[in-house]
C-alpha cells in the first residue's frame, strides 16, 4: 500500500496589524455562492465598537468589533460570547439593578446611556483565544489600551451592521 505524503500546510494566525486576506478557491462555481471575509480586515476598516456581521446563520450572527479605548455600556437581551482574537481586552461586568432596561423581545444587545445602576460582578482581562460569557441580566463594557479584535456571538440586533457586498469575496481569487 502506497502512502501519499500530504502537502505542506502552514497555519498563520493574523492580527489587526498583520494579516493576509486569503479567499475562497473556486474550482467550478461562482465565488458569490460562498461567504468569505477576513475579520482582521473588517476590524481594520471599522470604527471602534461597530458591530459588523462577518457570519450569519438565520438570526444568529458573529460580529467583529474593533476594540480601541473604552466602549459604552451594553446590556444583552440573551447570553452573548466574546472571543478575543487580537490584543488584550478588559471586560467589565455588572449585574443590573433593573434588567428591564432591555425590553422583552429585544435581539442582540442595547447601548445604555452612561453607567447603569448595578452591582459590580468583576473584570475579565482576556487575550487572544480567551472567551468570556456576557450574561443576560448584566451589562458589559470593553476596554483596550491598544487596538484589538473581538468576535461577538449573538443574535442580529438593531445595531448589527451588515456589509456583505463590501466585506465578502465576489470574484474568483487570482491565481499566481
Where are these regions (language model features)?
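A short, N-terminal "cap"/entry segment at the start of jelly-roll beta-barrel domains
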Residues: 1-63, 70-72, 167-170, 176
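Conserved short histidine dyad/triad with adjacent acidic residue
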Residues: 61-78, 95-99
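Short hydrophobic/aromatic patches on the structural cores and recognition surfaces of FHA
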Residues: 65, 87, 129
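His/acidic/aromatic-lined binding-pocket segments of jelly-roll/cupin-type domains
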Residues: 72-74, 79-84, 124, 132
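Short, conserved beta-strand element in jelly-roll/cupin
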Residues: 76-97, 106-112
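Short acidic-glycine-tyrosine-enriched beta hairpin
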Residues: 96-136
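Ligand-binding loop in jelly-roll beta-barrel domains
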Residues: 119-131, 136-160
Amino acid at each position: 500500500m502506497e502512502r501519499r505524503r500530504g502537502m505542506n500546510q502552514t497555519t498563520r494566525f493574523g492580527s489587526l496589524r498583520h494579516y493576509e486576506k486569503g479567499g475562497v478557491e473556486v474550482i467550478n462555481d461562482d465565488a458569490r455562492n460562498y461567504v468569505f471575509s477576513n475579520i482582521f480586515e473588517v476590524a481594520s476598516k471599522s470604527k471602534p465598537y461597530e458591530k459588523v456581521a462577518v457570519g450569519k446563520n438565520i438570526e444568529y450572527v458573529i460580529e467583529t468589533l474593533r476594540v480601541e479605548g473604552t466602549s459604552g455600556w451594553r446590556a444583552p437581551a440573551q447570553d452573548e460570547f466574546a472571543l478575543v482574537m487580537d490584543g488584550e481586552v478588559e471586560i467589565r461586568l455588572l449585574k443590573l439593578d433593573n434588567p428591564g432596561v432591555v425590553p422583552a423581545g429585544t435581539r442582540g444587545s442595547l447601548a445604555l446611556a452612561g453607567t447603569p445602576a448595578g452591582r459590580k460582578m468583576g473584570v475579565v482581562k482576556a487575550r487572544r483565544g480567551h472567551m468570556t460569557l456576557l450574561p443576560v441580566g448584566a451589562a458589559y463594557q470593553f476596554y483596550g489600551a491598544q487596538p484589538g479584535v473581538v468576535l461577538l456571538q449573538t443574535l442580529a440586533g438593531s445595531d448589527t451592521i451588515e456589509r456583505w457586498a463590501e466585506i465578502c469575496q465576489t470574484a474568483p481569487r487570482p491565481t499566481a
